[in-house]
Amino acid sequence: KVFSSLTCPHCANFHEVIFNKLKIEYIDKNLVRFEHHSFPLDLAALNAEVVLRCNTNNDIKFKLLEEIYKKQNFWAVGSDINRINDLIKKVGLDFGLKENKMDECLKNNEVQDEILNQRIEATKKYKIESTPTVFINEKKYSGEINYKSFKKIIEKNL
């Protein structure tokens, strides 16, 4: 389980540097299961997660998650939430999402409430204090952890 915020630079770095190696060595080989858990730290992250969930195709959703992190410096800038929403929708358009569908999703309070309630529950259950926070077999890891350290932890748990 990885709890992360889509506007968190440390989360983007984790996803780009560590996660991609884990994916090749363990996830793609079905040795390890990856679960993305949204832990939005701000409205921009919440809306980006809404756009991510707007897509029902899991294969595309996973690639869109990668792209959202990769383009974080493009869309997660400034404080104008309308501009940020337009920029995150541009990322979604590249993956075949329809603008009107994304607009519908962004106006859907049920989806936002679900994401926020999941965050509240994660805070209570897992004592999340920062992002990214990773759980491997229910053991919590947060802060700066390099790939080599993650690999050792995973190997020990296989």
Where are these regions (language model features)?
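Short, contiguous strand/loop micro-motifs
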Residues: P9-H10, W75-A76, C105-N108
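Aromatic-flanked redox-active Cys/Sec active sites in thiol-based oxidoreductases
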Residues: V2-C8
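Structural alpha/beta surface segment adjacent to cysteine/selenocysteine redox centers
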Residues: A12-L93
